[in-house]
Amino acid sequence: MIVKTETIDSRLENWINEYQPDKIVVVSSETSFKLCLPHLSIHKKIDNIIYRLPDGESAKTIDYCQDFWSAMMRNEVTRKSVIIAIGGGAVLDFAGFCASVFMRGIACIYIPTTLLSMVDGSEGGKTGINFYGTKNIIGTFTKPNAILRNVDFLSSLPQTEVLSGWAEIIKHGILQGSVIWDMVKNGIPSFDDEEYWMELVRQNIQFKKIR
């Protein structure tokens, strides 16, 4: 689902009201903790457990997994709890994996904050961490309970992150050869054009689902 900030809040609230988790565990990268999490109402719930990870692939280690699982046990997280992952692909990989094996699986919601994770990393149900220098060698195929993509977050990205995601969109456009490619030819749109970004992300998600 591609939404705006206020819609993410209402969707999260609806999901929480329906699922009634006993605890909410927020996993966030350092950058998303500073730039994205404060814009979500979930940040204001004082009973939330917030676990912060370093940015990028350095977070995807067994050491961080063990530390995170220990933190959840100390806070008496149960199978009725939910993990909400806020960040790029590395955070989603980490949180999805940890959720899939803790107590044989607890609920997990993805809120991707980078362009690459919105159009690619959050789809497919792949989770994983790196081990002994091999990327994603330990992992599971576990789909999250929900994915909420917020295009408002794109304006917080550095140029390198935008270009990384745009490269993936170009690849999708070449492979699809129709709508996405036509949009790619128009160049990177202004972040003020939220409707265009929402449609662009939507087209990429649909392409990923049929591959």
Walk through the language-model features, giving the residues of each.
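ATP/NTP phosphate-donor binding region
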Residues: M1-V82
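Catalytic phosphate-donor-binding core of small-molecule kinases
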Residues: R11, N130, K209
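A residue-level structural signature of the nucleotidyltransferase/glycosyltransferase Rossmann-like core
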Residues: I24-V25, I83, C108, A146
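A glycine-rich beta-strand to alpha-helix segment
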Residues: S81-A90
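Short glycine/serine/threonine-rich phosphate/pyrophosphate-binding segments
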Residues: A90-F97
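A glycine/threonine-rich phosphate-anchoring loop and its flanking beta-alpha core
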Residues: F97-D192
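Oxyanion-binding "anion nests"
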Residues: G187-R211
